[in-house]
From Swiss-Prot:
The lineage of its organism: Eukaryota, Metazoa, Chordata, Craniata, Vertebrata. This is Hemoglobin subunit beta. PANTHER family: HEMOGLOBIN FAMILY MEMBER, HEMOGLOBIN SUBUNIT BETA. It comes from Echinops telfairi. The keyword Metal-binding applies. The modification N-acetylvaline is found at residue 1.
Length: 146
């Protein structure tokens, strides 16, 4: 991902203020509610029958935390996301058969969640920087599909 030093600073500063566990749980929960067809990859998570069931599901919350911690780790590798996420891309492509569009959906939902959490502090400049990050991560995760 091509980012200026100023954009990288915006991203890391906001990430440092984010409750990653809560944001991860909310992000994955929202993906599963807003895009219900994504639930097919999480049948082993138990009850996903309603928005409340999804948002309160401990397995959804735990996996959302895991996903966002991985994204946070990727922030240290913005110049080489494809290499950093190569193993995860292979796992999601070859073993889990996840539709790569889901990575884009999750990234966009994360941006919405961050906007909600940070309010006015999530300026258009911060949003633009995060859109670059989530697009870069989605592309890296989809890399093995090509």
């Amino acid at each position: 991902v091509h980012m200026t030093d100023a954009e990288k600073k915006l991203v890391t500063t906001m990430w440092g203020k984010l409750d990653v566990d809560a944001a991860g749980a909310e992000t994955l929960g929202r993906v599963l509610v807003v895009y219900p067809w994504t639930q097919r990859f999480f049948g082993h998570f138990g009850d996903l029958s309603s928005a409340c069931a999804v948002m309160d599901n401990p397995k959804v919350q735990a996996h959302g935390k895991k996903v966002l911690h991985s994204l946070g780790d990727g922030l240290n590798h913005l110049d080489d996301l494809k290499h950093f996420y190569a193993a995860l891309s292979e796992l999601h492509c070859d073993k889990l058969h996840v539709d790569p569009e889901n990575f884009r959906l999750l990234g966009n939902v994360l941006v919405c969640v961050m906007s909600r959490h940070f309010g006015a502090e999530f300026t258009p400049q911060v949003q633009a920087a995060y859109q670059k990050v989530v697009a870069g991560v989605a592309n890296a995760l989809a890399h093995k599909y090509h």
